Amino acid sequence: MEQPEDMASLSEFDSLAGSIPATKVEITVSCRNLLDKDMFSKSDPLCVMYTQGMENKQWREFGRTEVIDNTLNPDFVRKFIVDYFFEEKQNLRFDLYDVDSKSPDLSKHDFLGQAFCTLGEIVGSSGSRLEKPLTIGTFSLNSRTGKPMPAVSNGGVPGKKCGTIILSAEELSNCRDVATMQFCANKLDKKDFFGKSDPFLVFYRSNEDGTFTICHKTEVMKNTLNPVWQTFSIPVRALCNGDYDRTIKVEVYDWDRDGSHDFIGEFTTSYRELARGQSQFNIYEVINPKKKMKKKKYVNSGTVTLLSFAVESESTFLDYIKGGTQINFTVAIDFTASNGNPSQSTSLHYMSPYQLNAYALALTAVGEIIQHYDSDKMFPALGFGAKLPPDGRVSHEFPLNGNQENPSCCGIDGILEAYHSSLRTVQLYGPTNFAPVVTHVARNAAAVQDGSQYSVLLIITDGVISDMAQTKEAIVNAAKLPMSIIIVGVGQAEFDAMVELDGDDVRISSRGKLAERDIVQFVPFRDYVDRTGNHVLSMARLARDVLAEIPDQLVSYMKAQGIRPRPPPAAPAQSPPQSPAHSPPGSPVHTHI
């Protein structure tokens, strides 16, 4: 059946489709002690940055700095501005060249070395400043064909150290701005047969490709044609992605109980226009295009007026990270008998010589991203639901490395090693109790509440939770502490209880006490199993979904406690670049490569 005109389907309003765009960071590049390839002077360096596609793993050139004449210690002026996603592994590559001509073909220039890292590594380093040695690998990529070619063809020696690259990340200032505004409307069209309209506004930001993404929806004002909506706040990047002149579309609807909301009309504006505040420039005619086409005398379907507008700068996730906040990562693994005998291929704990099991895949996907925000890379790893040697005592909080005093493992590989070792020594048993591991991490989080540390607990489980009441109480208590909980459900069990713990729809409570914050994120592993066998891509999606809420959860805790970000640590003193004989240090050559 064709939808009546001026009606919108419920699905358009089910959720705020399209996440807030990532914050943008500016990467600054410096190098020290580059190889000297020029016979009678120093090298003329250029840095090329590449990003790697998540799906095809191909390196794509992102941009180039300027060429700096006659120096082995360049401080490049031209920056790289990139979108930052905490929840994604954003691989970067930096190639250095000594430019010998005006040719844009990189194979015409001497290769000086390269470095690989992730954006998270740069951001998570002390002061968001990362130093890495430049090396000449066995292969580099031909800039024209994209195919590997021997790096030695440019005169390098594979594996040789070629100086140091220094990468600094700075969040762009307009990414931290939050706009607060209020609107009212006057003489909106009457849509309800037995009463006035029930109007609400829907805001959309425009995308680069001309499409629109919903970014805010006001509350519904019942039975009025002259509504005054409540004041609301929204990150500027959500409204316009930092582009002050980008179109913002606002649609006006009449709410209907059955979800088939009636379209009243629309108008467009921009952040720059809104920032003028209350004025004649911010009174908008609400236009219904279909009515305008059909009726010659049509004027408008009412007006919407901006009553107030203010913008302030808020502390962001990256402010806290740059100020030294460490993310303490702990993993807890389900060793209950419902996983199946680890020696059999049907077991969720089966260790195939050919591929990682679901537990190891989930752990690696989350761990390899979060590890860069913990400077010592020592991660506590716990197990629950097993009988331990030598006496068969059932434990719901045992160290995978067997060390009761210090359950920390060195890196993600250390956790995997301890996990595999535990499978050979403990007996899978039960029941599935979460409360002990939640309480364990909460105890550590409670010990440091000055903003210098934030704990993230990853629980990987296969079964129906056995201690729901105790777990709810532990989570409600943990919600006032600097910690978040990620739960990944593996296997084919029903995970209804996990969805309840997630608290996206209904905030969890215990003994009549509501959790102060939503700190739990749950995903079922089976939703990410790629039938094509592309585990890399499917696990990247899993990590993205479970980690996406962590930055906001960290900031919400800090704000609730009144904790401001600390100033970034001072950068270590560098030896000043040596001035070349006939060119000031850092003077760019006017050659566009």
Curated annotation (Swiss-Prot):
> Could you tell me which residue ranges the VWFA domain spans?
328-554
- The protein's superkingdom reads Eukaryota
Q: Which tissues and organs express this gene's product?
A: Expressed in the cerebra and cerebellum of newborn brain. Expressed in the eye, lung and muscles but weakly expressed in the adult brain (at protein level).
Which organism does this sequence originate in? Mus musculus (Mouse)
Instruction: State where Ca(2+) 5 binds.
Output: 192, 254, 256, 262
GO CC annotations on file: neuron projection; neuronal cell body; perikaryon
Identification of the protein by name = Copine-5
The keyword Calcium appears for this protein:
yes
